[in-house]
């Protein structure tokens, strides 16, 4: 079966309605992009968690619908525009989509990732290249964290060097569960992963089962009382600052904490918030992102 992309540009107030109508009328997929991307008029859409976004749609949007090549694009777009309440259908262009083995193409884009000394993040269709590797089998999915992002990589390198056998570990903002799973494979004892997203929690549980890693996952209200030998939080700078007191309280006196999701220019500000609880500093920087790490003082 062959496909084409139907591409239309229109104001933000119509983009979502047209997208929904295209899906209802048989488009195989629909995406919305900033039509001004990579120009001086490009508009960042979302800010960090904890901040109210300035806008929820791009002023000038590009709607891209993947359609069966047998469909008449003009008829489809006219019907979608009518369904969406537009006065008339927007102008559009068609792009031919080359026939592909989509499964093979997707798999080829995700090769094993080597991190630290012995860590390999390996999709299920690959074998680990290193016989004595710490292997995490993880396929791309809904939850953040496959080892490709600099912040995930930094936290994994830190855990590989830090975790000692039997230590308790809290992964706050666990996403795919990759850090919690790694901690367990590094010999940790009780490991807990917490995330605000129920989908992430389910994905993390699935990934732990595949990796035969005994990790307990839950939402923030499920976070156990008590302290941990190690706390790792790969989130973003604003929520890290807002949760400083809580996260610091989860670290045992003398225990270790690592924070990432922090840009290099944000490091001093985040570190200053944690300084009242933790002796903390930049541990390592990679591609403009940093991992802050430190030890909780015996009393605070």
Swiss-Prot record:
Methylates ribosomal protein L11. The keyword Transferase applies. GO terms for biological process: methylation. Coiled coil: none annotated. S-adenosyl-L-methionine binds at residues 152, 173, 195, 234. Keywords: Cytoplasm, Methyltransferase, S-adenosyl-L-methionine, Transferase. PANTHER family: ELECTRON TRANSFER FLAVOPROTEIN BETA SUBUNIT LYSINE METHYLTRANSFERASE. GO terms for molecular function: protein-lysine N-methyltransferase activity. Belongs to the methyltransferase superfamily. PrmA family. It is an enzyme of class 2 (transferase). CDD domains: AdoMet_MTases. Its main location: cytoplasm. This is Ribosomal protein L11 methyltransferase. GO terms for cellular component: cytosol. It catalyses: L-lysyl-[protein] + 3 S-adenosyl-L-methionine = N(6),N(6),N(6)-trimethyl-L-lysyl-[protein] + 3 S-adenosyl-L-homocysteine + 3 H(+). Its EC number is 2.1.1.-. It is found in: Cytoplasm. InterPro entries: Ribosomal_L11_MeTrfase_PrmA (IPR050078), Ribosomal_PrmA_MeTrfase (IPR004498), SAM-dependent_MTases_sf (IPR029063). The keyword Repressor does not apply.
